Amino acid sequence: MRTLKIEPLTKEAFAPFGDVIETEGSDYFMINNGSTRRYHKLATVETAQPEDNAIISIFSAEKLEMPLRIRMLERHPLGSQAFIPLLGNPFLVVVAPLGDVPVPGLVRAFLTNGRQGVNYHRGVWHHPVLTIEKRDDFLVVDRSGSGNNCDEHFFTEDEQLLLDPQSNQ
């Protein structure tokens, strides 16, 4: 079983899968009589149909025990999905490129710094939220509308991957 190498999350490395939502290194302009920096358009919400809505939810996720066997990935073909951490804890992101099914050899893992969010582009394969330190809350921006917007792919036992933060140290 292949152990995923966990990479630091950067805009450049994550670009094939979506957007990194962070203020560090991002352009801004001043608003509210000069008292507020606006980091404008850090990500774009994608929806498939004009009648779809962009919605905001909060996910409260329990810590997952590591190492974790990656048995499945999911994708949202009708809209993007963004996760912004609310409590400042680092979390893991596991993704695979667009395609009919995720290719195990192309799966990548990233570690956020706790202040970075991610916006998965439409159709990008990803693992459900991976909280690693303690229970965590995420502001989630995604799509509401008709149609099935969640495809799941389960790997065969031979294709499964191991996510082990200790292996990177």
From Swiss-Prot:
It is an enzyme of class 4 (lyase). Pfam families: Ureidogly_lyase (PF04115). GO terms for molecular function: ureidoglycolate hydrolase activity; ureidoglycolate lyase activity. It comes from the Bacteria. Pathway: Nitrogen metabolism; (S)-allantoin degradation. Gene3D superfamilies: Ureidoglycolate hydrolase. Keywords: Lyase, Purine metabolism. GO terms for biological process: allantoin catabolic process; purine nucleobase catabolic process. Catalyzes the catabolism of the allantoin degradation intermediate (S)-ureidoglycolate, generating urea and glyoxylate. Involved in the utilization of allantoin as nitrogen source. Homodimer. Belongs to the ureidoglycolate lyase family. This is Ureidoglycolate lyase. It comes from Pseudomonas paraeruginosa (strain DSM 24068 / PA7). The lineage of its organism: Bacteria, Pseudomonadati, Pseudomonadota, Gammaproteobacteria, Pseudomonadales.
